[in-house]
Amino acid sequence: MPQNDYIERHIKQHGRRLDYEERKRKREAREVHKVAEKAQKLTGWKGKQFAKKRYAEKVAMRKKIKAHEQSKAKGSSKPLADNGEALPTYLLDREQTNTAKAISSSIKQKRLEKADKFSVPLPKVRGISEEEMFKVVKTGKSKSKSWKRMITKHTFVGEGFTRRPVKMERIIRPSALRQKKANVTHPELGVTVFLPILGVKKNPQSPMYTQLGVLTKGTIIEVNVSELGMVTSGGKVVWGKYAQITNEPDRDGCVNAILLV
């Protein structure tokens, strides 16, 4: 089945334009001027949003540069003043190069990079069209308005979820199609447990479906695994863990998932 990779396939078969690199270089060079022009010309709400976005980008860049500098920094700590007293064993290496901070920073960076890289059981799934996902709901006195949509797939909503007023609710999530628990299988132990769902981490179809909590095949969900008695290396009980849905919940009427360990 195609996975919307026709552009990559075409590049592999026929290659790129001969002037691709030059065009890309020029486009990137022009981008700076476009950003500067937007920063000067945008006013009102758009200007505020743009400034907020730029500020967040600059903060992230500063943090990244600082973390990079810390990982490279290998300075020796200040030696203790010599009072003629013998130093204890654990203070003898104070004058040597201190690499603890550099190692700690590099470990943190690697953890951040690997945070969302799971070897999931289902790396590819079938694409779902909007016509299949949403059903048009006619409203109004003469049923002439069609701005409402009803989700036809199973969804997850939190404990304190409250529907919006009827005249303001654009997307309806039917109560009959809401799921609170999932049949989660542990791949190493080979046991299946009925666990409560804590949230939807990522729906492969679209970020909007993730926000709406739509449960389709391949969706990464977070489940409560406290019943399994799993503990960390530090001895703390693991509360939530990610799992991937392996079935079609709207066809089976239940959610089956495999725990990502």
UniProtKB/Swiss-Prot annotation:
Q: Which UniProt keywords apply?
A: Nucleus, Ribonucleoprotein, Ribosome biogenesis, rRNA processing
Example of a GO cellular component annotation carried by this entry: nucleolus
Tell me where the sequence motif Nuclear localization signal 1 sits in this chain: 15-22
Region feature Disordered, mapped onto this chain: 64-84
Instruction: Give the record's family classification.
Output: Belongs to the eukaryotic ribosomal protein eS8 family. Ribosome biogenesis protein NSA2 subfamily.
Species whose genome carries this gene: Candida glabrata (strain ATCC 2001 / BCRC 20586 / JCM 3761 / NBRC 0622 / NRRL Y-65 / CBS 138)
Nuclear localization signal 2 (motif): residue ranges: 51-58
InterPro entries documented for this protein? NSA2_fam, Ribosomal_Se8/biogenesis_NSA2
* Subunit structure, interactors included: Component of the pre-66S ribosomal particle. Interacts with NOP7 and RRP1. Interacts with RSA4 (via WD repeats).
Q: In its UniProt entry, what is this protein called?
A: Ribosome biogenesis protein NSA2
From which domain of life does this come?
Eukaryota
A family per Pfam: Ribosomal_S8e
| Major localization listed first in the record, in broad terms | nucleus
GO annotation, biological process: maturation of 5.8S rRNA from tricistronic rRNA transcript (SSU-rRNA, 5.8S rRNA, LSU-rRNA); maturation of LSU-rRNA from tricistronic rRNA transcript (SSU-rRNA, 5.8S rRNA, LSU-rRNA)
